[in-house]
Design a protein with these regions (language model features):
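Anionic-ligand binding patches
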Residues: 2-11, 17-37, 41-217
């Protein structure tokens, strides 16, 4: 029987409930106890994403959450890069249509800007950066990218963000099951990238993972 109470605690530094669910599934088996901001007394705490890159924002958020909570924190920043839009929305993906815009608003803006652009020129990628920090110290980062094409309409209900217009083969990312998405997504690849750093950090705390996590390429 594993004594879960003795596991190292890591704060999930995000207010996005969809990211909480995905990161929880992707980090399962590492031998750590994931803590939500609400469970750490951080209701309403958010970090201004003032960095000019996804890497800068992921580090900024991990460091800020770790400092505020007084415990290690893991944070993600992700973005959609559309080649025909010069890499936009990129680091501004969440704020692309304004601070108070919905996912539907952001999707509509991207599709309007791509109106008339042929499918062969609608190449895009999702990029994710994950950072692990202790209070006052960055432990490490991981990155992940997945390539696709922007469709001409929203499809599927399983995803969030820009997932409904991001096509991987003949399906949008929002048409994938959660298990399928977690096996192929940019965030899963970022977790795989940072996994050795997490394992080394956990080992230094005297803990090892519960089981092996499938590798992703």
């Amino acid at each position: 029987m594993i004594d879960r109470s003795s596991r190292p605690r890591i704060l999930v530094g995000t207010t996005n409930p969809h990211k909480v669910v995905e990161l929880g599934a992707l980090l399962d088996g590492l031998g750590c106890q994931l803590v939500l901001p609400t469970d750490a007394g951080l209701e309403g705490f958010d970090v201004d994403e003032t960095g000019d890159t996804l890497m800068a924002n992921a580090i900024l958020k991990a460091m800020a959450f770790a400092a505020r909570a007084g415990m290690p924190a893991l944070a993600d920043d992700s973005g959609l890069e559309v080649d025909a839009l010069g890499g936009e929305p990129g680091v501004r993906s969440r704020r692309y249509a304004g601070d108070d815009a919905s996912d539907a608003d952001r999707i509509a803006l991207v599709l309007s800007k791509l109106d008339g652009v042929p499918v062969g020129s609608r190449t895009a990628r999702f990029r994710s950066v994950i950072a692990l920090a202790e209070p006052g110290r960055l432990v490490g980062t991981g990155t992940g990218t997945v390539d696709g094409v922007i469709g001409d309409m929203a499809r599927g209900t399983n995803g969030f963000g820009y997932d409904p217009i991001f096509l991987m083969g003949d399906r949008s990312m929002a048409e994938l099951t959660p298990a399928e998405k977690n096996a192929t997504s940019h965030r899963s690849r970022a977790v795989a990238s940072i996994r050795p750093i997490l394992e080394a950090w956990l080992s230094a705390q005297g803990h090892v993972g519960d089981d092996a996590m499938p590798s992703r390429t």
